[in-house]
Amino acid sequence: MRYIKSITQQKLSFLLAIYIGLFMNGAVFYRRFGSYAHDFTVWKGISAVVELAATVLVTFFLLRLLSLFGRRSWRILASLVVLFSAGASYYMTFLNVVIGYGIIASVMTTDIDLSKEVVGLNFILWLIAVSALPLILIWNNRCRYTLLRQLRTPGQRIRSLAVVVLAGIMVWAPIRLLDIQQKKVERATGVDLPSYGGIVANSYLPSNWLSALGLYAWARVDESSDNNSLLNPAKKFTYQAPQNVDDTYVVFIIGETTRWDHMGIFGYERNTTPKLAQEKNLAAFRGYSCDTATKLSLRCMFVRQGGAEDNPQRTLKEQNIFAVLKQLGFSSDLYAMQSEMWFYSNTMADNIAYREQIGAEPRNRGKPVDDMLLVDEMQQSLGRNPDGKHLIILHTKGSHFNYTQRYPRSFAQWKPECIGVDSGCTKAQMINSYDNSVTYVDHFISSVIDQVRDKKAIVFYAADHGESINEREHLHGTPRELAPPEQFRVPMMVWMSDKYLENPANAQAFAQLKKEADMKVPRRHVELYDTIMGCLGYTSPDGGINENNNWCHIPQAKEAAAN
């Protein structure tokens, strides 16, 4: 204990760097380098050494920089680095989660209910066990010779600063050289690979969560500008409404984590969508999301193509389709089982109610707070707007982990299930629970359709992102450059009521939808804006609708008009 108290802050930083950089990243090293023994090359050996050294040196560099704030502040900040890294290491070790912007955005969401569902007893025990030793070192050390103290002391400035700068160079230079080597391989093979430095930064603690946290903070500042700073398509372009839109109801269901390759209507071996399979007025597409986390997808899936930056945080540049419809005369209500208030306010909805508000309603007391409560809210909304030209947005929990909590016991069709986050579930158990949740999604969508079956209505559905459910990877939120394909697989659907199809133009558009669905034409999130406008019958003479993205666009129409 006397030694712990007496060592300098620089030595303590190095010891902590070894602990965080090597021990907490142990599972990542094993996965990245495990295959090297069977296919070893000199460059692979060099890269392994470089990455091992980089994780230690970058942590040392960070801890020394933090000591510029003084001894007391350093203790607090270093403790946070340890705790955050220990927490992240749990998911990296046991769930093989890549800690990127999507994960940080999900953790920092105001929707605590969903976030806490992936925190169990095992996580807490791991956090305590892994962080105890470094926290003891931090709080029992005198923290002598912080970088701030050394810079103020003549004779120590150059040497102390040189050590920090050298650590930074020793991280950057080897990684840069390996990046250059990789570029040469890319040119020789014609294979496009992600940046080597970017892969390393996203793979290891603490650089992965620190860089993601920095992006999240920047995005929050970026989002603080209101809708007036965003391009407004309703003002930039001319939108001509069809004659028969004033009595139309539009419903958009935002799904959560549901994958099309686990839905029976797309050929999945289990009949997870028995009710949707009976809908004759439904066109269902194999879709691909614009990102892998809710907060990111909500930024890019409802704007025109290019309406969100192609950067990690998906900076918004334009107003979304719901805000445009509001400005075109639609009344609108938004009901959510989540709490993405930044997005909800951007829709310009007349009425917004999220989970806590809905659950507090007297009619909902004692009821489980799940997606079916949104159907009750929808009924109330329809009753208040009997004349149509009304938009209802429903943001669901869908198939979000913990899957078993997404559906009532009566939908537990496939067993055994994955009961809890700490239960050590097998892949089969997780799939059983996931498929049960998809069946409940089927029930929910069908229930929504039932509310407008006798009205002139169109219902859209699109999940925000997919999910990884296998031995190597779980959950979602992986940076999209690194994400596996299943995190992008989302079902996208359009349903039109019989009354809506009484209009010949709408019937023709639906026939086009069915034709493309039968041909298994893949669809994308970035096509939703133009599709919603197009399927409602809006036209734009000055480019407000990209017909290439409009699923309801009939290619022969132009030829017929020309003749």
Write out the residue ranges for each language-model feature:
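Transmembrane and membrane-interface helices of multi-pass
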Residues: 1-196
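Catalytic cores of PAPS-dependent sulfotransferases
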Residues: 65-75, 95, 324-334, 347, ...
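Extracellular glycan-modifying ectodomains
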Residues: 86-88, 157, 176, 361, ...
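Active-site-proximal alpha/beta segments of enzymes that process anionic O-linked groups
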Residues: 174-419, 489, 524-558
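A long, amphipathic alpha-helix that forms part
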Residues: 238, 376-380, 417-461, 488, ...
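Active-site-flanking alpha-helical
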Residues: 263, 449, 471
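Histidine-centered active-site microenvironments of extracellular/periplasmic hydrolases
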Residues: 267-271, 457, 462-505, 545
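A short beta-strand-to-alpha-helix junction
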Residues: 312-319, 428-440, 480-489, 501-532, ...
